[in-house]
A protein has these predicted regions:
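Active-site-adjacent loops and short helices of periplasmic peptidoglycan-processing enzymes
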Residues: 17, 21-165, 172-179
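Bacterial N-terminal signal peptides that target proteins for export
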Residues: 1-10
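Bacterial N-terminal signal peptides
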Residues: 9-19
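Conserved active-site loop region of the serine DD-peptidase/beta-lactamase
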Residues: 177-187
Length: 187
């Protein structure tokens, strides 16, 4: 089972490396999810803009709500005008239409759909503001000391920050607490 989780964490590290320009590579951390051993790192605690890695916290909170029964995978949630107005990438559903939590999670994590981050936030907590408050409370509870969220999709806001270390911890927590949802990360 430990080898099963190594691939997503290694992929997260590779994506971070590939997304950064060669001359100005961003902070990074690569660790073994089974043991927690850090294999290599560069400025892992340095604050930086998380972009779409924000969606990992969005997914984590949704996974917690699925576990407690607050949400169900087959539950339909409405697309609000606010969710529909999010910048691309998005799937572009019309306000008032409905989507299952399962499909919203798939499009959030596979296509990085910004509109689905808002749909899930509103479906889970009623408002994006309340969801973001929960994101920050959860980050604090997990010890993500360099992390502060302003929105659930990662669209740019200079106040939205994290670190490679914090994202690594969050990824490991997701894999440890919710192995049943690992398929969302391998599509």
């Amino acid at each position: 089972m430990a080898g099963h989780f190594r691939k997503p964490v290694l992929m997260l590290g590779l994506l971070s490396i590939l997304a950064s320009p060669v001359a100005h590579a961003g902070p990074s951390v690569l660790f073994d999810a089974a043991t927690g051993e850090v294999i290599t790192h560069d400025r892992a605690g340095e604050p930086w803009y998380p972009a779409s890695l924000t969606k990992l916290m969005t997914a984590y909170i949704v996974f917690k709500k699925l576990k407690t029964g607050t949400l169900r995978l087959d539950q339909k949630i409405l697309v609000s005008p606010l969710a529909a107005s999010q910048e691309p990438s998005k799937i572009g559903m019309r306000p008032g239409s409905a989507i299952s939590v399962d499909l919203a999670l798939q499009t959030l994590l596979v296509y990085s759909a910004n509109d689905m981050a808002y749909v899930l936030a509103e479906g889970a907590n009623g408002t994006v503001f309340s969801f973001v408050q929960e994101m920050n409370a959860t980050a604090k509870k997990l010890g993500l000391s360099a992390t502060h969220f302003v929105n659930p999709n990662g669209l740019f806001d200079p106040r939205q920050l994290t670190s490679a270390r914090d994202i690594g911890v969050l990824a490991a927590v997701i894999l440890a607490e919710f192995p049943e949802y690992s398929g969302y990360f391998s599509q």
